[in-house]
């Protein structure tokens, strides 16, 4: 990074990595909570029923697809904004 010493750059990288891990854990925790709440309703057995298992699979797939598409869309918007700013 410009203007940073090697030590400052390493510290910044470590902080960014920690932040990314925290954000990932938050997204993962929300995914687990949302899919569990939406899909699991029978607590009479240790194992998931076939319906619950299928529901969780669909929920996770849908959530991951949504996150992927959101990331792509934000990237597209960021690229468009960057291009617009460079034209000025």
From Swiss-Prot:
Heterohexamer; composed of 3 copies of tim9 and 3 copies of tim10, named soluble 70 kDa complex. Associates with the tim22 complex, whose core is composed of tim22 and tim54. Interacts with the transmembrane regions of multi-pass transmembrane proteins in transit. The twin CX3C motif contains 4 conserved Cys residues that form 2 disulfide bonds in the mitochondrial intermembrane space. However, during the transit of tim9 from cytoplasm into mitochondrion, the Cys residues probably coordinate zinc, thereby preventing folding and allowing its transfer across mitochondrial outer membrane. Disulfide bonds join 35-59, 39-55. One of its GO terms (biological process) is protein transport. A motif (Twin CX3C motif) lies at residues 35-59. Belongs to the small Tim family. Signal peptide: none annotated. It comes from the Eukaryota. It comes from Neurospora crassa (strain ATCC 24698 / 74-OR23-1A / CBS 708.71 / DSM 1257 / FGSC 987). It is a peripheral membrane protein. This is Mitochondrial import inner membrane translocase subunit tim9.
